[in-house]
Amino acid sequence: MVVIRLSRAGAKKRPFYHMVVTDSRKRRDGNYIERIGYFNPVARGQEVKLHIDMDKMTHWQKVGAQLSDRVSALLKEHSKKSETAA
């Protein structure tokens, strides 16, 4: 099954996550099919905390990719911010 989930990167005590499309049997930080965004939980000031390429996200969801729990929560948060900004 194809899933959209977070892959950890960054230094110790400074996490940074790539939002990736991957096979569910692969390791968390292993090979992936496509990178579609990123999440920086420790963003400061004007740094972007969450970036998602929505065209790629909708494409993979139409193809049948499942969202992880954390990614679906981040997507909800992202859509709320988009609505309030618009």
Swiss-Prot record:
One of its GO terms (cellular component) is small ribosomal subunit. The keyword Transcription regulation does not apply. Disulfide bonds: none annotated. GO terms for biological process: translation. The keyword Glycoprotein does not apply. One of its GO terms (molecular function) is structural constituent of ribosome. Pfam families: Ribosomal_S16. Keywords: Ribonucleoprotein, Ribosomal protein. Belongs to the bacterial ribosomal protein bS16 family. This is Small ribosomal subunit protein bS16. It comes from Legionella pneumophila subsp. pneumophila (strain Philadelphia 1 / ATCC 33152 / DSM 7513).
